[in-house]
UniProtKB/Swiss-Prot annotation:
Keywords in alphabetical order: Cell inner membrane, Cell membrane, Electron transport, Flavoprotein, FMN, Membrane, Phosphoprotein, Translocase, Transmembrane, Transmembrane helix, Transport
Pfam families listed in its UniProt record: FMN_bind
Assembly with partners or alone: The complex is composed of six subunits: RnfA, RnfB, RnfC, RnfD, RnfE and RnfG.
E.C. designation(s): 7.-.-.-
Necessary cofactors: FMN
Membrane topology reported for the UniProt record: Single-pass membrane protein
Name by which UniProt lists this protein: Ion-translocating oxidoreductase complex subunit G
An annotated Gene Ontology molecular function: electron transfer activity
Membrane spanning stretches: 9-29
Function recorded in the entry: Part of a membrane-bound complex that couples electron transfer with translocation of ions across the membrane.
FMN phosphoryl threonine found at: T176
Family named by the database record: Belongs to the RnfG family.
Biological process per Gene Ontology, one example term: electron transport chain
Amino acid sequence: MKQIIAKNGLILSLFAIITSGLIALTYFGTQEQIELQRQQTLLAILDELVPRGSYDNLMQHDCVLVTSQAYLGSNSPQHIYRATRAGEPVAAVIEATAPNGYSGRIELVVGLSGDATVSGVRVIDHKETPGLGDKIDLRISDWVLGFNNQQLTQDNASNWAVKKDGGQFDQFTGATITPRAVVSAVKNTALYYQANKEAIFSASNECRSQLASQG
């Protein structure tokens, strides 16, 4: 009887070890897949905002982390991805937050060229009302394309507002708060970039992705 119990115990132990190993392999395999998908999504967004042929570095692996609640809308670190050519600045894609959306925080990325012209804006995450505030999402409306090729200057700063507030950007019927929040966030991001461009491109690379280490 003792031999049978010992044998069964050994079998159960081996089974537990094998199961744990399979779970670990599945976990790490899943994590790698998640990271791969994240990198692919990131690269697709960067390609939309900065033409790949305009720079020669690995932009998705070249970034700095910054924190500016006043300008970037969050007290958590935000990524700034840097595009360079022959070591010279070409563009940057900056993560930003509009903290005052109608239904909460709106996460976005803003592409800015070397002279601080907006190359594009994409909303990454939001909880705005379907059929109203969700028009900030490019999948719903082309409203966000209105930022393309806009440049913030001292002379036109007052234009960086929705039309209801005397600016140039359309608001939505029945939903002014949402576009107002996004316009303000993009404007503040442009201001941050203009004030910190030199520091952004001279800082050490802080991107440490798994794919970069594997490559």
